[in-house]
A protein has these predicted regions:
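Short, charged low-complexity linear segments at domain edges
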Residues: 128-150, 370-378, 417-436
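Radical SAM enzyme [4Fe-4S]-AdoMet core and its adjacent flexible, acidic
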Residues: 2-13, 30-37, 254, 261, ...
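Short cysteine clusters
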Residues: 159, 166, 170-173, 390-393, ...
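Acidic, low-complexity/disordered tracts enriched in E/D and polar residues
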Residues: 1-77, 142-144
């Protein structure tokens, strides 16, 4: 049980998500969100979310130490920190922590702070930490959570004013034809209100997506208003002009993910239903030139199996990070034309085997993001360390264009769980339906609920 001094500190300082960014303008920026456990679970660990994707459990004493350091760092937001300033902040954080732990030597607290920060930076940058770090899966932590770690914001609808509202018409679009994907779009002020509500709900990461989010004239304003969050933009890249990229960089967008189906213009254009290859490629170049962290995403099918060539092409554009997937079984990807291009397990394994050889050669990073398409042992044998599992109502949720809350960004045909503008967050999160979907995800059985485990619920209107 926490001591009296620890309980007092928690009541005053640790009831909400805390956030700092180290080296914000550098290539090795480290975003740290410290997420408290439920108030009725005082012995549960705090959870650190590093750069929006790495999870680290933290005990209470180190959470208090880190919170005190965050308090000292906050006044320096956007400023360059000298070595003397850094040491002064660390000393002040140690002194404040000593008030909660008066029988612990300040030298020990200082050593702990240094070890913790060094280790967190190492983990965030994919390096080996000095400290021993425990392993914590979301399945183990699910009962302590009060919100997902990421909310995907579908800023733009697939249809608007009765007409198609996207500058592409992708063969495998997960949103096309789903009822909530065509919902009326919210205004700028309504999305700004939602960002405030998401922060109050302790959700540390948002993704701006669509449809095509760059069709929104207020995109930069919304990204700028979301600087407390880890932010990502999912786009087809056609509208990523040098001017827009510079503004997004100035608004502190953390990363941009561009969908590139192939290095072959004809294949890419056939799959996106538009003559967009050159604009997408130029958009990638513009984003890289602006200093944005860029990743390329490729849904894999029988028409773009030369994925190794796509990775080489992406690397030539300055891209280091890549993701690929099977076809999400929703929207247009449920149609006969898309289904006919789905890869067999053997074919997909061959594509990934060739891809892994290329990323190893070029020093790129590759993740496969579709749960249930390949067995875990196959993915590990290929050298893929991320084993995807369904995150619906657990690690991630999404908002439709009208603010409707849905289990994930592909879950656009069933009744919403609520609306972010009008419903109390706790009542949505703790509702029987949301809890049931979360319980399925928490099994961590590496199956997409729209594909297997909860298909009936996903199809229910």
């Amino acid at each position: 049980m926490p001591t009296f001094l620890e309980q007092r500190y928690c009541r005053k300082h640790l009831r909400c998500v805390r956030h700092i960014t180290l080296d914000p303008k550098g290539r090795g920026a480290v975003r740290i969100h410290m997420i408290p456990p439920r108030e009725d679970a005082p012995d549960a660990p705090f959870l650190l979310l590093l750069n929006g994707d790495k999870l680290v459990p933290l005990n209470l004493s180190w959470a208090i130490l880190l919170a005190n350091f965050m308090d000292r760092l906050e006044p320096f937001a956007g400023l360059e920190i000298s070595e003397s300033d850094w040491h002064a902040m660390a000393d002040a954080a140690v002194a404040e922590t000593h008030k909660t732990y008066p029988f612990t030597k300040k030298t020990e607290l200082a050593e702990d702070l240094s070890l913790m920060l060094t280790s967190l930076v190492a983990i965030a940058r994919g390096q080996e930490p000095e400290a021993e770090v425990g392993v914590l899966s979301l399945g183990d932590y699910a009962a302590e959570m009060t919100a997902p770690h990421r909310m995907d914001l579908m800023l733009s609808a697939m249809r608007k004013d009765g007409a198609w509202h996207c500058n592409q018409k992708c063969l495998h679009c997960y949103a096309a034809g789903q009822s909530l994907a065509d919902a009326p779009e919210l205004s700028t002020q309504q999305w700004l209100d939602i960002l405030r509500r998401l922060r109050s709900a302790n959700i540390p990461q948002v993704t701006f997506t669509g449809g095509e989010p760059t069709l929104r004239a207020d995109l930069v304003e919304l990204v700028d208003a979301a600087q407390w969050f880890v932010t990502r933009l999912n786009t087809n890249g056609q509208l990523l002009t040098p001017e827009l990229c510079a503004k997004l960089y100035g608004a502190s967008l953390d990363s941009v993910q561009v969908t590139l189906y192939s290095a072959d213009p004809a294949i890419h254009n056939a799959l996106v239903g538009a003559d967009g290859f050159e604009k997408t490629v130029q958009g990638i170049r513009n984003a890289v030139a602006a200093g944005l962290i860029v990743s390329v995403n490729t849904p894999l099918c029988s028409l773009n199996t030369d994925y190794a060539a796509t990775l080489r092409f992406a690397a030539s554009l300055g891209v280091r990070y890549a993701t690929c997937s099977g076809l999400i079984p929703s929207g247009s990807a449920e149609g006969a034309e898309s289904r006919a291009t789905r890869l067999t397990e053997q074919a997909l394994t061959q594509v990934l085997q060739e891809a892994e050889a290329v990323v190893e050669e070029l020093g790129m990073e590759l993740d496969f993001t579709s749960p249930g398409w390949l067995p875990e042992e196959t993915l590990r044998a290929l050298g893929l360390h991320l084993i995807p599992s369904c995150g619906a109502c657990l690690s991630n949720m999404a908002l439709a264009p009208d603010g409707s809350i849905i289990p994930c960004q592909s879950w656009l045909s069933s009744a919403p769980l609520g609306n972010m503008l009008t419903d109390d967050w706790a009542s949505v999160w703790n509702s029987e339906r949301c809890a049931a979907i979360r319980a399925e995800s928490a099994k961590m059985d590496h199956v997409c609920q729209l594909q297997g485990g909860n298909r009936e619920e996903g199809a229910r209107c």
